[in-house]
């Protein structure tokens, strides 16, 4: 049976491994490295998190490991359960099991994670991106020419990007758009700080557009190990081919909106599998 791997933060229990009976000798950082090395042999890992045992338990650690692929997680569980791996005593490995009903909305991967996932399944040369439009929508210059006695409203840098991700081997193209708005005060911050913020906003717009393009792609892993791609366009997606077609698209996406930074995304994605949602299975 084929497995579908979306460009989304893995939150499913069948993609999560619980590892315990970890020795108290090494540090948490050393255990993180050893776990990553051991389990990454079975598939691409999203995260490895190491926790100290509860005070009422014996000294040691346990870990929560997330895979992008449920199939890879199952292989790792079967191969590593009750094995010594990197320590003298065997570890115990189980697939995650939620003990209460918890609903989570899937979070999109940021651009760095998307590229990591694409490189793993398609190869470094198996995909590319093409920027169609990168436009600054700020109105800072106009505001500077206004009467200096009139209080200026809060100014901001705003960049729009439209691009497409191309997969030549699969004859597939996926468009994406991104809009970033960052508050700025050119007088207080100075020219150097303003230029740095401008460069950062421009880069973030490209990253958001890249992530948006990947969200419309679904990796299909066949039983034979071969890879296919499914393109799933949203109803409101416009296939932009030329600059003229971008005008309406820009107008639609220019409304103010609260944005979640990459650091916030990583925090929220890990929060979805906090330790209270899972229990360690009782073993005979």
Curated annotation (Swiss-Prot):
InterPro entries: Nucleotide-bd_a/b_plait_sf (IPR012677), Rad52_fam (IPR041247), RBD_domain_sf (IPR035979), RDM1 (IPR040224), RDM1_RRM (IPR034200), RRM_dom (IPR000504). Residues 90-133 are annotated as: Necessary for nuclear and nucleolar localization. Keywords: Cytoplasm, DNA-binding, Nucleus, RNA-binding. Its main location: nucleus. GO terms for biological process: DNA repair. Residues 1-92 are annotated as: Necessary for nuclear localization and for nucleolar accumulation in response to heat shock. Residues 15-98 form the RRM domain. It comes from the Eukaryota. SUPFAM superfamilies: dsRNA-binding domain-like, RNA-binding domain, RBD. One of its GO terms (cellular component) is Cajal body. One of its GO terms (molecular function) is DNA binding. It is found in: Nucleus; Cytoplasm; Nucleus, Nucleolus; Nucleus, Cajal body. Homodimer. C-terminal half contains cytoplasmic retention domains as well as determinants involved in its stress-induced nucleolar accumulation. May confer resistance to the antitumor agent cisplatin. Binds to DNA and RNA. This is RAD52 motif-containing protein 1. It comes from Macaca fascicularis. The lineage of its organism: Eukaryota, Metazoa, Chordata, Craniata, Vertebrata.
